[in-house]
């Protein structure tokens, strides 16, 4: 197929106008999943019969009524559906969610028909989707390469045209990295924009959030309206927008002061990733923005990684406790992958005082980082330091962790600071693999990023660029 499939906004319009039915669109999407998934391994839990029943019934009259959708199998719990989190012990025990998350209720109320749940690395702990429990997801642009992670199953599904948009989540880059590696739009919202409830209040000391991967800025903006909102007991609440995010698409962002950070002396960044950022800088100048080489002094603080890893390690140890409760016995070393067992073991050795010290450190560091936006509007950087790596490169038991640390240098900072950041598909490598560019805005100002992203989408459209495995 050489013609791009409609985005979710267009599909919703077709349904409302009577030019298509939800049953037709859901059947078409299921056919694509069944035909393509043997190549990319994106969908690990199917609910096709339930989806067909929902499509034929009375759907909520939301903005995406009847549009097919997929949900990442990490969080976004769906009552009665599997929730394996990429883990074999949860898979083998047949663990299912007891109740819908607030997020999934919002997705359902918007009218989406969910076809299934997508592949994710175990516990979302890395930026490639190669769980031992379900096998690797493969990049539709080149099946020998990674989709990124941890939302790699969702990204592969959207890139291949199975559905126009899919749920994703991000604790250190897990929306932006798969979006970068699969040629999609991937917005990480501000902290407190989307509720984790009722199952949780926060993740990784406030670093995690949900979102989507999509093929258009307008889909991403409209979906942020769907997913946003506070619920009783939420520990963080983002400042509400002045108008719907969907209304920001097409609005002139004005002349922005933009800092460009194509590389850093302490980070070995692939020249093609550097070139992607430099090309984005040139395009921004052509659009009338003020662009200069600049970045926050705190961006590459040498202490950051140590404190972030401490927080993630403790959270992993807590995951083990919760997983044990779900399967009815303690989690042992044979129940999880080696890298996660190591991370959880580190977490178990961290004292309460040391954990609180790390949380306090990242809070103080975040204030230093965010101060840069007092003088600038947007920071532009690589998403990840290499183009999409081969399958197995990051999951290698001997070198995977070292490689992960070396390339994941540009995204976790904004999980910790809580700022919105988006990956846009503006560049392709000489080998034909997507390389996204990251744009970071001030806290709670997704609206600014949406205006800028839509301007860039118009100036350098990507919708017609399709992978070899598509539709």
Residue spans of the language-model regions?
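An N-terminal boundary/leader segment
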Residues: 1-50, 286-288, 344, 348-349, ...
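Serine-dependent amide/ester hydrolase catalytic core
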Residues: 10-16, 31, 108, 264, ...
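Acyltransferase
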Residues: 19-27, 56, 101, 244-247, ...
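Acidic/His- and Gly-rich active-site-bordering loop/insert found
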Residues: 51-133
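Short helix-loop capping/hinge segments that flank enzyme active sites or metal/cofactor-binding pockets
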Residues: 64-89, 250-262, 311-370, 420-433
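Short glycine/serine-rich loop segments
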Residues: 99-231, 415-436
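A short helix-breaking turn/cap at a secondary-structure junction
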Residues: 188-281, 451, 459-470
């Amino acid at each position: 197929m050489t013609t791009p499939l409609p985005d979710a906004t267009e599909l919703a319009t077709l349904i409302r106008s009577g030019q298509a039915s939800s049953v037709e669109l859901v059947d078409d999407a299921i056919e694509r999943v069944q035909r393509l998934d043997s190549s990319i391994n994106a969908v690990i839990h199917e609910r096709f019969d339930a989806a067909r029943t929902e499509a034929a019934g009375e759907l909520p009259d939301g903005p995406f009524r009847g549009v097919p959708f997929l949900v990442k199998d990490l969080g976004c719990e769906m009552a009665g559906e599997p929730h394996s989190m990429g883990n074999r012990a949860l898979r083998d025990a047949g663990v299912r969610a007891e109740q819908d998350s607030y997020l999934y209720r919002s997705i359902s109320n918007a009218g989406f028909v969910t076809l299934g749940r997508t592949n994710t690395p175990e516990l979302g702990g890395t930026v490639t989707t190669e769980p031992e429990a379900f096998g690797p997801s493969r990049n539709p642009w080149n099946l020998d390469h990674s989709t990124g992670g941890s939302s790699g199953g969702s990204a592969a599904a959207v890139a291949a045209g199975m559905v126009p948009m899919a749920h994703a989540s991000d604790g250190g880059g897990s929306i932006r990295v798969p979006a970068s590696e699969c040629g999609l739009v991937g917005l990480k919202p501000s902290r407190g924009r989307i509720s984790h409830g009722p199952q949780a209040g926060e993740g990784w000391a406030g670093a995690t959030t949900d979102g989507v991967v999509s093929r258009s800025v307008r889909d991403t903006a409209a979906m942020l309206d769907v997913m946003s909102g506070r619920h009783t007991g939420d520990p963080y609440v983002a400042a509400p927008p002045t108008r719907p995010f969907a209304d920001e698409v097409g609005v002139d962002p004005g002349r922005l002061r933009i800092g460009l950070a194509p590389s850093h002396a302490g980070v070995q960044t692939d020249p093609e990733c550097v070139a992607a950022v430099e090309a984005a800088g040139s395009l921004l100048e052509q659009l009338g923005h003020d662009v200069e080489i600049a970045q926050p002094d705190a961006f590459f603080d040498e202490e950051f990684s140590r404190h972030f890893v401490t927080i993630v390690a403790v959270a992993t140890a807590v995951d083990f406790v919760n997983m044990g409760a779900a399967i009815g016995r303690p989690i042992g070393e044979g129940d999880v992958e080696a890298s996660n067992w190591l991370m959880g073991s580190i977490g178990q050795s961290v004292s309460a005082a040391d954990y609180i010290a790390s949380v306090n450190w990242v809070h103080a560091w975040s204030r230093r980082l965010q101060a840069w936006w007092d003088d600038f509007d947007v920071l532009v950087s690589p998403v990840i330091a290499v183009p999409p790596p081969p399958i197995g490169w990051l999951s290698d038991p001997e070198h995977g962790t070292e490689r992960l640390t070396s390339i994941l240098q540009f995204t976790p900072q904004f999980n910790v600071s809580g700022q919105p950041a988006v990956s846009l598909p503006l560049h392709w490598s000489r080998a034909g693999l997507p390389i996204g560019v990251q744009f970071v805005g001030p806290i709670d100002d997704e609206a600014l990023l949406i205006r800028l992203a839509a301007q860039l989408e118009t100036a350098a459209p990507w919708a017609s660029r399709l992978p070899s495995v598509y539709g």
